[in-house]
């Protein structure tokens, strides 16, 4: 049953002028490389050296490549690491969608997504409960959130976050006003990516002024299928170049890039003023999505990255 008892806040992040172009980094974790525990019928990540090494590796790559915003998958960032990420964001003028963590709230738990800006940390709540988070006991499991937000006047534009199953709630997305959003972030831990892709394609097509959707999903065997991705519209000839290199198979059409199973991240730039390319092109109509850095096997970045986080020798 969908949760209908929630509010949508308007958060004015700053008075900064929006950047015409931003660099984004999607991070993808592999569950088996990290340590987990079950607490009150909820799967929670443990704050260990393995996780710390991965976070440091990601943030080092982000810093060295001038990233403006990072997104991590659902359940990947424990509350104990949020303060460290905020210090990093403040020092590097960066935005971080810091996955989610569970917080005890009354008899049960709330799922919190920290939206970290250079100025402060905002909290939004996951609104709807997935089948894996429910429990027959009143003091266990996740019982649904009460508050989410639209973020305005930020350097990366107007944006919102829908955590995993919340993205499938059309009523919630209607209250977030998709036509006013420039970016939608979807941190996730799910094994039905095809269903998410279908909805993302529709939402990008239906956006009047154009919108990019950034999807960061956990890779966890049968529980979560990875396939983190970026959705947006492009001129056909530009998108064809991505098809040739295997960045996308256009299934569906507005899928611009899908991370492979052995990828941990991708960095790309987005033209925030050309979110919906028109058919009427001119000499200034370029490419609104550009790949900056991939950890692809061809240049051994996967090996170097895994070595850095001590997953391999």
Residue positions per predicted region:
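N-terminal, active-site-proximal structural segment of metallo-dependent hydrolase catalytic domains
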Residues: 1-68
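CN hydrolase (nitrilase-like) catalytic-core segments centered on the catalytic cysteine
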Residues: 85-97, 168-286
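A short C-terminal boundary segment appended to hydrolase-like catalytic domains
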Residues: 265-313
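Structural motif
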Residues: 68-69, 157-159, 182-183
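Active-site-proximal beta-strand/loop segments in catalytic clefts of secreted hydrolases
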Residues: 27-30, 74-75, 99-102, 127, ...
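Cys-nucleophile CN-hydrolase/nitrilase-fold catalytic domain and related Cys-dependent amidase chemistry
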Residues: 41-125, 190-193, 197-202, 207-208
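Active-site catalytic loop in hydrolytic enzyme cores
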Residues: 2-17, 105-179, 197-201, 260-270, ...
């Amino acid at each position: 049953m969908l949760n209908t008892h929630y509010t949508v806040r308007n958060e004015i992040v700053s008075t900064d002028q929006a950047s015409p172009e931003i660099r984004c980094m999607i991070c993808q974790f592999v569950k088996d490389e990290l340590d987990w525990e079950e607490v009150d019928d909820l799967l929670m990540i443990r704050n260990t050296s393995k996780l710390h090494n991965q976070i440091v590796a990601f943030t080092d790559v982000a810093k060295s490549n001038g990233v403006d915003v990072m997104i991590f998958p659902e359940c990947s960032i424990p509350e104990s690491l949020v303060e460290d990420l905020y210090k990093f964001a403040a020092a590097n003028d960066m935005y971080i969608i810091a996955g989610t963590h569970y917080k005890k709230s009354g008899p049960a738990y709330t799922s919190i997504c920290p939206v970290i800006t250079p100025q402060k940390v905002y909290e939004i709540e996951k609104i709807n409960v997935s089948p894996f988070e429910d429990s027959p006991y009143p003091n266990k499991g996740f019982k649904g959130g009460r508050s989410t937000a639209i973020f305005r006047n930020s350097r990366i534009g107007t944006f919102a976050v829908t955590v995993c199953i919340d993205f499938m709630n059309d009523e919630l997305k209607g209250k977030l006003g998709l036509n006013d959003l420039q970016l939608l972030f979807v941190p996730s831990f799910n094994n039905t990516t095809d269903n998410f892709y279908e909805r993302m394609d529709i939402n990008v097509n239906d956006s009047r002024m154009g919108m990019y959707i950034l999807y960061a999903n956990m890779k966890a065997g049968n529980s979560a299928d990875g396939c983190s991705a970026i959705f947006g519209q492009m001129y056909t000839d530009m998108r064809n170049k991505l098809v040739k290199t295997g960045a996308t198979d256009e299934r569906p059409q507005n899928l611009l890039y899908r991370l492979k199973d052995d990828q941990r991240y991708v960095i790309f730039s987005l033209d925030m003023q050309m979110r919906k390319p028109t058919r009427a092109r001119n000499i200034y109509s370029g490419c609104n999505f550009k790949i900056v850095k991939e950890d692809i096997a061809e240049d051994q970045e996967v090996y170097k990255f895994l070595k850095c986080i001590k997953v391999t020798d």
